[in-house]
């Protein structure tokens, strides 16, 4: 598994509030929950580019457990997108889209019927590009089930 060197410093320099993301993850420990940064922010971390979007996060807990943990930790959130397994966590100027790991059960081409999963590999199949399926944990370790890093670096050069 690859790791981003000097992860805390890189996050600070790029504007990712990793300390708060770790606070969210700590709140999930009762259920052995893990949280990952995913999507464009991971791409930007790898390329060492400034962050222009609020971090997208994904957790390996179902929505009910996620909401329970956040409420217990007094972390503010909005229940938007619940039927899609998604909420918004509020922190200072940030609005984190936090989504439970999901897999598609069926789709009509536009909307998918989803089911919770705790598998990065299954969740990654829903992502639009391979480099949007690179997951970064709170210590900077990268999980890359679809070889998105290779695609990202090819595109960069």
What do these predicted ranges mean?
Residues 1-157:
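Catalytic cores of the polymerase beta-like nucleotidyltransferase superfamily
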């Amino acid at each position: 598994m690859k790791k981003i060197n000097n992860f805390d410093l890189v996050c600070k320099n790029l504007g990712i509030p990793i300390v708060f993301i770790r606070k969210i993850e700590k709140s999930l420990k009762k259920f052995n929950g893990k949280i990952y940064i995913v999507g464009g922010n991971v791409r930007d971390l790898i390329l060492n580019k400034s962050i222009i979007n609020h971090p997208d996060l994904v957790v390996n807990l179902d929505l009910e457990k996620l909401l329970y943990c956040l409420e217990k930790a007094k972390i503010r959130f909005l229940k938007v997108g619940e039927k899609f397994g998604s909420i918004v966590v509020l922190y200072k100027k940030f609005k984190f889209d936090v989504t439970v790991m999901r897999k598609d059960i069926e789709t009509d081409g536009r909307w998918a019927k989803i089911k919770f999963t705790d598998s990065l590999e299954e969740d990654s199949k829903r992502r639009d590009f391979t480099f949007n399926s690179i997951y970064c944990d709170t210590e900077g370790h990268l999980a890359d089930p679809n070889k998105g890093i290779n695609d990202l670096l090819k595109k960069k050069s």
